[in-house]
UniProtKB/Swiss-Prot annotation:
Cytoplasmic side stretches: 1022-1052
Gene from which the chain derives: MBTPS1
Glycosylation sites: N236, N305, N515, N728, N939
Segments passing through the bilayer: 999-1021
GO biological process: ATF6-mediated unfolded protein response; cholesterol metabolic process; endoplasmic reticulum unfolded protein response; lysosome organization; membrane protein intracellular domain proteolysis; mitotic G2 DNA damage checkpoint signaling; protein import into nucleus; protein maturation
Protein name (record): Membrane-bound transcription factor site-1 protease
Subcellular location: Endoplasmic reticulum membrane; Golgi apparatus membrane
Residues the record lists as Phosphoserine modifications: S168
Region (Disordered): 877-899, 1027-1052
All copies of domain Peptidase S8, residue ranges: 190-472
Residues spanning the signal sequence: 1-17
Site residues by UniProt (Cleavage): L186, R187
Amino acid sequence: MKLVNIWLLLLVVLLCGKKHLGDRLEKKSFEKAPCPGCSHLTLKVEFSSTVVEYEYIVAFNGYFTAKARNSFISSALKSSEVDNWRIIPRNNPSSDYPSDFEVIQIKEKQKAGLLTLEDHPNIKRVTPQRKVFRSLKYAESDPTVPCNETRWSQKWQSSRPLRRASLSLGSGFWHATGRHSSRRLLRAIPRQVAQTLQADVLWQMGYTGANVRVAVFDTGLSEKHPHFKNVKERTNWTNERTLDDGLGHGTFVAGVIASMRECQGFAPDAELHIFRVFTNNQVSYTSWFLDAFNYAILKKIDVLNLSIGGPDFMDHPFVDKVWELTANNVIMVSAIGNDGPLYGTLNNPADQMDVIGVGGIDFEDNIARFSSRGMTTWELPGGYGRMKPDIVTYGAGVRGSGVKGGCRALSGTSVASPVVAGAVTLLVSTVQKRELVNPASMKQALIASARRLPGVNMFEQGHGKLDLLRAYQILNSYKPQASLSPSYIDLTECPYMWPYCSQPIYYGGMPTVVNVTILNGMGVTGRIVDKPDWQPYLPQNGDNIEVAFSYSSVLWPWSGYLAISISVTKKAASWEGIAQGHVMITVASPAETESKNGAEQTSTVKLPIKVKIIPTPPRSKRVLWDQYHNLRYPPGYFPRDNLRMKNDPLDWNGDHIHTNFRDMYQHLRSMGYFVEVLGAPFTCFDASQYGTLLMVDSEEEYFPEEIAKLRRDVDNGLSLVIFSDWYNTSVMRKVKFYDENTRQWWMPDTGGANIPALNELLSVWNMGFSDGLYEGEFTLANHDMYYASGCSIAKFPEDGVVITQTFKDQGLEVLKQETAVVENVPILGLYQIPAEGGGRIVLYGDSNCLDDSHRQKDCFWLLDALLQYTSYGVTPPSLSHSGNRQRPPSGAGSVTPERMEGNHLHRYSKVLEAHLGDPKPRPLPACPRLSWAKPQPLNETAPSNLWKHQKLLSIDLDKVVLPNFRSNRPQVRPLSPGESGAWDIPGGIMPGRYNQEVGQTIPVFAFLGAMVVLAFFVVQINKAKSRPKRRKPRVKRPQLMQQVHPPKTPSV
């Protein structure tokens, strides 16, 4: 039995440790070595950004020598009579080359010198210099959690970054992303992410990233790190005199891309160019990045990894330089952000069309909870966001190089980004015609070959999971052409096409806008020939829809946009069914060589469209969301709605029904309401079509014409529901930012909502909000509620219904750190317009219960009740009979807030003129008018399946076979005694398998199967040996008694 126990013990060890077969321990002591599959450290990223006082970046229209730049600035400032200025020296590797910017210091308050600079013909723009702070803090996680348990039990919060920061989260493998522990299919997790994605197949073919220049913009790299053999150059762009990595993040990123041993990278033979752009104190400046980007262009970098990001897509010098980089054929790969699962949290530059934006998944192919979601918010309020991320790949528990050697595991999209950057570097080395590789063609190959993940929408996964081998197949058959992202529009396909598939279209509704990205692999510049053509399929009722187009006049760099507005024709107002058609566009680019005498390359692309049409819903079921009056960072400082959330100082998610109000939108749809978005002033919608106008967290001002029209609309039956937020000038001054280093104040431009503007809108009905600031938990109609930094109602009509509660005075707490309880705070008001056919108005002082950003307890039930009231005039019994109902406040003892003096809202407002003094409205803009495309009907049947892998040049991926491995396969040797890590391979080529899952899993199970069979036979042998022996029967001699008394026999 001892032998049996030994075999069973071996079997258990093999079953529990099969994941680590072939791995070598990085530590010699079992007691000190943690489980290789998980770590007990979590990396928390905290960051901020401030404007450096008196320092400005002067951008020029071209590249000039230092002498010429100095001359331009001097001549411009001479006429302004500004004497106290100087050019700040920049001592870095690009100082000896011409540059397109300069950093100057001007100590003046009137900004006359800045205006004079901008008037100079050679100066393009003058913007403030920004100082960036990042803090990477390691925190102990719960060591009692088993290695194979999910780590999603912790609460993830949006970091709401002010700046570009490293996008790594922590260490440890997350093998499953379910929130609850449950029975699930387990499989062997490969050792290395490069082998998981089958990079070893390309290694065996002889491709290892050789002759490809890859840049890593991060925290540096040690000179003699054992994992790297081809570090071509290390440059320092900071004010510290070191090139080494004191934090480890840059080393990890470089290791994922090009490590040659232990935690193997994708391209071990690539030429590494290390750009140290962060100090050991985790500080950086915009100008450091600009200089480093210029140097990367000079060095003809092929691939650039940027595992940093921030929400400021209006940081013009940075964004412009990224465009210039990609225009110079640099393939930029960037992390999409770690602010998931909240929508509308994409980081720049990953959200740019010319950049490959990467999201994260775990090793079970689930979207990582931390990975930021789309849509882009550049286009709001008038348009609709683009599809991002582009692709997703492994970003949870990925192993990479440690700062002094060995391996560590980290999680975050800054981990997923170098995975794609390494894969791209490897792919570039496989292409024979290197001139065909550019930022567009590489992105086309990646998204066309990506594997779609089931049950995940387009704003979470982009085009799907990175597939390295399929991308290799496409690139090696590629011919320059244009393509689209997404490659089709199917408003009936759920969940992938969410939110488009969540609501059918109908006559009279706001047009549905789909923002498509055009990728132009033919050249850095291009154009759309003539206009796009709309061709409806008559057998599929395509003539029941009409489309309008808006598109880039010039496709640069490598990309552009095509916005398609889809609406229903009047003849289909009562029709229900599916309508289909397609759009044809032709893209032209200049010829590749001058020998073609100015001839253009052209590429024609088809965009299928499929929509579901229903009869126009009744007015009572139609809700109009006011997007036009919602503002968000960037560019202004619009503070958070919940002042308790100190780690998220800005309101930057767009305040859209498909971003941070997504859950509210989903709830309204489940209740049968149809929600449309208004991206124009109130003068641009037909109020007779809608039952309720929903205004939530509004920060914008109002045109006088809007106020007058809204009054008429409410008198004629339109209802109004307003969810407000705090506005207190004393608190606004208190929450301003102060930087001890730069002595710079950053003042809020408004409160959580623009209460002074709302009060002007409501004054005609004798309503208004106060400047009170309240917080607390309460119960309303048997529902637990939380009031998070809300305001109160200052005045309300006497014949209205008002609900009050008892709260803490949060304003007093913020200002004086004192606690006080206030009773009978009016928070909810309901009012019926007395005129016949008039609408209804509802006021509520807090929007956090609808906002996904920091919602603690939702109030969707309350929204349902309020919409029942506004749509049908029935006061909910739970509110009309509430014990908290009080007499409406007359406004005599309440204070309504005034606009804060010195605010800069006019700089970012669509309503106010930019001038000193009292705010003055701009002229009312014209309402957008769409030009519907002339249809070119087709009397043919539409394709049945719109989703097909985007076939570039009719490449059939299912029929393409990988080439045979090259004969010069690498020779591997075992590790020498004392050497840590994996195999050491001459030439940097790493052994692998054709199919990672088959190659790794089959030998393991075969070995385990053999062990089971062997154990079975051992058990049987031991049983046979231990069984008591059976005695042989002996022939007994007859006894005397038997002879005397014979045995009885049956009688017949």
